[in-house]
Amino acid sequence: MAHNDTIDIISSSPEFPDISVLVAKAASKKSALRTGSNATPIPSDAVGLGTFTSAASIWHLSQVMDEEKPTKNSSSRPAKETPAIATSVSTVAVEVSATTTTAVSEEKPGKKPRKPRKKKDETTAAVDENAPPKPPARRGRPPKQKDVEGQPALPKSKATKPAAKPRASRKKAETVSKHFAASAHASTADPPEEPSKNPAASKPPKPIPVQNIDEPVDLEPAARRRLDWTPPPDDRPPPAAGNSSVVKELPSSTTAHTEPPVAFGKLLDTYGCEPETIQPSEGTKGNVLGKRKLIEMVATTTTTNTATDKLTSPETSPTKPKAPKKKPRTITDLATAAYRIQDPVDDSISTVAPKQDTLLGYIDVEDEDAAVKPGGAKTKAVSKKPAKARVSKKKPEPRKQLLLSPHSALRQVSGQNFVFGTSSQLVTEDTDLLRALHESMKTAGNAQESDPFMSSPVKFSNIASRSKMGNNKLWRVGARDEDGDLLDLEIFDLTEAVEVPEDVVQQADKPAVDVPEREASPRKQVEREAERAIGIFSSDPVATERLTITGPETLISTLSIKGKESVRRTTKSPPPNPVAPPRERTPQRARPPSRDSLSSRLRSPQTETSPRPTTPPRVSAVLDLDYDFDDYEPPPSNQEHYQLLEQSQKTSPSKTQQRKQQQQQQQQQQQQQKKRDPPPRPKYEVFTDAQLSREIASYGFKPIKKRAAMIRLLEQCWESKTGAATGKSTGLGDNTLQEGTGSLEPAHRSINSVAVSPDRGRGQTIQGAHMQEARAGIKMAASATKRPRKKAAVASASAPRTSTMENPPKAATAASTSTTTAPLPALSASTSKRQRRTSLSSIRPRPPILEIPDSDIDISDSDPFASSPPVSSPDASPPASQLFSTPEKHHQDHKHDLAAEMSLITDCEESLLDMTSRTPSEADLFKHITEAITTAPRTTNPSEPSWHEKILMYDPIILEELTAWLNTAGKGLDRVGWEGCEAGTEEVRRWCESKGVGWVWREGNRGQVRKRF
């Protein structure tokens, strides 16, 4: 019966190929998933290798897992073995048959007792022999039971969907833990991790020789890496080189060794616990990097590399540069180092200070090194640079900061060396020059207080250094005279001078026989001579224009760089200037001056009579340099030069001052003479508009726009002021005019008989009957000359006149404005029309071109009527004929031009002239008009403002409307109590002009403005 049982087992064996076929089909679909990006490439020479590992490694892992864990459940193991076997690239038939028999042997113990296990070897052999004929022999039910048992592997490979139905219906599927099922789905790369752990399953791979070859290659390196690279996420954050190697080896068989023990636990470790593993990795990695850097730094600085130095030096290194004492290396530090107050330095600190100056000193720490390192190492570091510390101790202590007095501060500044400023411009390759300049500055500071700019002579041993001072452009260009004008000195090139024989130089060195030696202060005498020359040049306007200096022959002698070359230029002086008086000169010879500045070397040497040159020479001066270099000092600055000029002015006044004094004396004499004689009439046509308006305001009149009206009014006022004193001069002009006209006596008598009180102030009213007569005369002249003046404006284009010249208007105008000595041409009735036209056309060819006066000219300080203005004074140069570019005849007959220009006066100016003839009744009327307008009630309608509001808003006042309002009962003049006659438009117009109110006439029918009534 037992034999029959075995036969039954054999009869059921043909069903096993069906299982392998199903597994093979599932594996064929599964291979597409395993050959993705995560699958490792399989070499072409590999034999028996799957997608992840070889068959030998699978059997070896099964043995290892059997040792670590007992067999828990054999039902799920064949499901994990079959995919790995099916997915192999080159599957050997022997290996497949072996695995299938093991799967069958593992499934049978679940149904039958374990007794028939002893015959497994026989069954496997039978199955291997009958492997090809198994597929055709199939039966219904027995294979279904075995398919159900092997079904749990199908969901893992995701091969077929209908396999899920028997999985839920069978009770055997529940024996598989959910954790294992999840691990089977999650990690597809771990099918060979848990093979069958039965001892029978581990027996077949032993005869395979490939297992012994792969064991030392795959297993041993994996164990070493697990020890060295203990959590894998440690090396992930930084891009280290080691991480790339780890990533490359993850899909290898070594990863299978680290993760397989617990599939579900490994999933949580690799994905859920990454943040916990990163924190310890940062600490360990920082320590490693810190140690490496510390080892490199300590190796360069010290000889002893101890563990304590490695730990302490990185912590204390940032606190080390707190007290480094460096030397000042910038320009500001160098300039302020001498004035900085330094703290006292101890000896202990000074010994360590040299260490901080070098780069090695920044690595070691003073306090911790002294505590950790032995004493011998410390003394060696200090003994390396002992000399540097001693040099720093020998530096002089800085002076205490004190508030010095001005004298002591100047003395201290004079003792300092110039690092910047003008002295740096003089620095050349020759250092003797700068050294000599400093010495001269120091000696100048110790001079006497009476003459602070006097300094002791400085000896120059080197001629080259002396010659460098000859090109001081700043002082020469900036030299100015007492009036503030620049000196136009001639520039000489000392480098390209002509060589002079020795005998000439020796002869020049000899002192002059006829010139006495200079006494106590030779410098002042030289300065006086220089100031005299400067005064000649600056005070003479003609000499300034011609750029010449009147005087004797000037000899210019200069030395070159070598001291043997010189330039001598001789210029013949012209005869004495006709404008400026000749100046006495002391016969002198060119003698080298001692201790004189560059700006004060203008001298007048030997005098000789010579003919006048054809061309005016340039301004020349003698620039005599010291031949023996015994006495020399640097040229003074502009400030010093100005002080020297002030001192020279105190001792010897210049020609300009003498000339000013003479002018003052002449003015005093003229004033005294004017008191006795009548003053000459001022030339108002020469005055500017501003001067004319100022003179008119001094008489109390309002400003006038037209220039001719201002001149006419001033002349009338001047005639009324002088009174009878001017009767003679005006009488001459009247007689000449009366010969032709004979009808101007009433007007001129009324004008000339007026006298004004001389002591009245500005703005005071003219009192007395004389002023009334003057007003009447002015009004007569203005009213009588309205029409003729209007016609005279176009006299050249108008029709020829008849005997209208006998009328008084033109003659009265000419007579009132004629005060010059030249007589007017007699225009009698017998004069022909052509002669009159030519005389008038010659009178007004063009108006005079007046020069715009300078702001310095101010005539208000002196009496404008006492004398003529400075530009028109007879003793001034040039005369008025040269000042104004007009013909001489025009200036002689300027009153004719003035008469012609008066014809351009408009009605506005005439009305201003009529203001002077205001009667008391008109003044009272104007007062009531002002009161009526200002006291009128304010309007409540913004569109109709009152007259006062219109005036305040600068609205033009219509004369007809204002006159009608003033004459309205109960509104204008009637409201303020005016009892006189009604106001007319002409009176209202004059009131507006007196108050400066803008007025207009109402337009006529043709759209034109009516000017007169």
UniProtKB/Swiss-Prot annotation:
Coiled-coil positions: none
Biased segments, Basic residues type: 381-393
Domain of life: Eukaryota
Amino acid composition bias (Low complexity), ranges on this chain: 86-104, 152-166, 300-320, 589-620, 647-672, 811-832, 862-881
Bias kind Polar residues: ranges: 242-257
Keywords for this protein: DNA damage, DNA recombination, DNA repair, Nucleus, Phosphoprotein
Regions of compositional bias (Basic and acidic residues) in chain numbering: 221-237, 511-532, 674-686
Any one GO BP annotation for this protein: DNA replication
Matches recorded under InterPro entries: Slx4_ascomycetes, Structure-sp_endonuc_su_Slx4
Region (Disordered): 63-263, 300-329, 374-401, 502-541, 555-686, 755-895
Annotated GO MF terms: 5'-flap endonuclease activity
GO cellular component, one term: Slx1-Slx4 complex
Subcellular location: Nucleus
PTM: Phosphorylated in response to DNA damage.
Matching HAMAP family: Endonuc_su_Slx4
Subunit structure, interactors included: Forms a heterodimer with slx1.
Function: Regulatory subunit of the slx1-slx4 structure-specific endonuclease that resolves DNA secondary structures generated during DNA repair and recombination. Has endonuclease activity towards branched DNA substrates, introducing single-strand cuts in duplex DNA close to junctions with ss-DNA.
Similarity-based family: Belongs to the SLX4 family.
Protein's UniProt name: Structure-specific endonuclease subunit slx4
Organism of provenance: Neurospora crassa (strain ATCC 24698 / 74-OR23-1A / CBS 708.71 / DSM 1257 / FGSC 987)
